[in-house]
Amino acid sequence: MKAIVVKPPNPGVEIKDVKDDENKLSNIGLVKVKILENGICGTDREIVSGKRTSVKPPIGKDELILGHEAIGIVEVGGYGFKEGELVMPINKRGCGKCLNCLIGRPDFCETGEGLVAGTKGLDGFMREYLYDDPKYLVKIPPAIKDIAILAQPLADIEKSVESILTSQKRIPIWTCDDGTLNCRKALVVGTGPTGILFSLVLRTYGFQVWIANRRELLDNEKEILDEPRILFYNSAKGYESLVKDVDKFDLIIDTTGASASIIQELVPLLQINGVLGLFGFPRYDNFSLDYKIVQDFVINNRIIIGLDNGQKPHFQQALIHLASWKSLWPKTASKMITKIISINDEREVISSLREKLPGEIKVKIVWE
């Protein structure tokens, strides 16, 4: 079968024929899925460029099938799945040892030995066919097939927001005087795909949301943010004027994955009882906090929390939110898929795996 393959840690990518795993169907409990489309994300590009040093092929192999975002159609079903149903595979798999993994929550793996499709020890989904355990498959409603590929990155954000709201249960009451979160203010740093998805989820929960970047918004970004009333702030000159206008924030999310020093810029912007969520992976620099800021952190019950992968419940929640956005913000939903490429256009596929388009939210590779 055809697949998109890398040889980590070396840079480069190719589309080639690989051995089909159809003999796996002789193993009781697997479902055969024909892949219809894949999403491309920043992780894929880091692997292709050779910058993601933690990437590991499956044991005994020197090649890795790329990709952790996919939608497919069931060809050989069973175990609760019917032929013709649309499904999405879950990318993170358990270590088989710790309790969290054994109960279906490898996002909290305690051994560090879990597998990640297309990244760590497990072939990914950029291939014609997949033979998978049904517990790692999520059913996709046909009505949202056009944007359902976003459910994988969105699942990570659903888990992140869940973690934040759970952490705020430490406070007797964090809702507003009308029982909602409408009075709570959130700042999302970064207007890339992750930042935009975070902003949309937070608006869905009722937060007032500001999104920041050190450049002006591109036209398509403006169109996406306008309908849900997400406010933009240009942070090129710092955040002083923003705090002056709107006061401090109950929640701040860093999605930039750039300089670690941004953390010390954001900490002073937190409201009492506030949360700073770190989602992006800083690539350089360092940060330090003055002892007075640390004291202030303790006295005012502020926290910093690391945010990571979602699991099956979060994929299901992501699909619910995607369906709701098509009704709540139809114009926004229609702008989320930036480009669609055929797997037969090899040159364009390789180019898209190497470079991100300006203002890109999601590029899809289709296999039909």
Swiss-Prot record:
Q: What keywords are annotated for this sequence in UniProt?
A: Carbohydrate metabolism, Metal-binding, NAD, NADP, Nucleotide-binding, Oxidoreductase, Zinc
Its GO biological process annotations read: non-phosphorylated glucose catabolic process; protein tetramerization
Source organism, top-level taxon: Archaea
InterPro entries to which the protein is assigned, alphabetical: ADH-like_N, Glc_1-DH_arc, Glu_dehyd_C, GroES-like_sf, NAD(P)-bd_dom_sf, Zn_alcohol_dh
Q: Which residues bind Zn(2+) 2?
A: C95, C98, C101, C109
Q: Where is NADP(+) bound in this sequence?
A: N213, R214, R215, F279, G280, F281, L307, D308, N309, K356
Q: Which cofactor does it need?
A: Zn(2+)
The cofactor note from the UniProt entry for this protein is: Binds 2 Zn(2+) ions per subunit. One of the zinc atoms is essential for catalytic activity while the other has a structural function.
Q: What is its EC number?
A: 1.1.1.47
List residues binding Zn(2+) 1: C41, H68, E69, Q152
Fetch the CDD domains from UniProt: glucose_DH
Record field: catalytic activity: D-glucose + NAD(+) = D-glucono-1,5-lactone + NADH + H(+); D-glucose + NADP(+) = D-glucono-1,5-lactone + NADPH + H(+)
Checking SUPFAM superfamilies in the record gives: GroES-like, NAD(P)-binding Rossmann-fold domains
One function term, GO molecular function aspect: glucose 1-dehydrogenase (NAD+) activity
Binding positions for substrate per the UniProt entry: T43, N91, Q152, D156, N309
Q: Which PANTHER family match?
A: L-THREONINE 3-DEHYDROGENASE
Query: Function of this protein?
Result: Catalyzes the NAD(P)(+)-dependent oxidation of D-glucose to D-gluconate via gluconolactone. Can utilize both NAD(+) and NADP(+) as electron acceptor. Is involved in the degradation of glucose through a non-phosphorylative variant of the Entner-Doudoroff pathway.
The name this protein goes by in its record: Glucose 1-dehydrogenase 2
Q: Which organism is it from?
A: Saccharolobus solfataricus (strain ATCC 35092 / DSM 1617 / JCM 11322 / P2)
Instruction: State the gene name recorded for this protein.
Output: gdh2
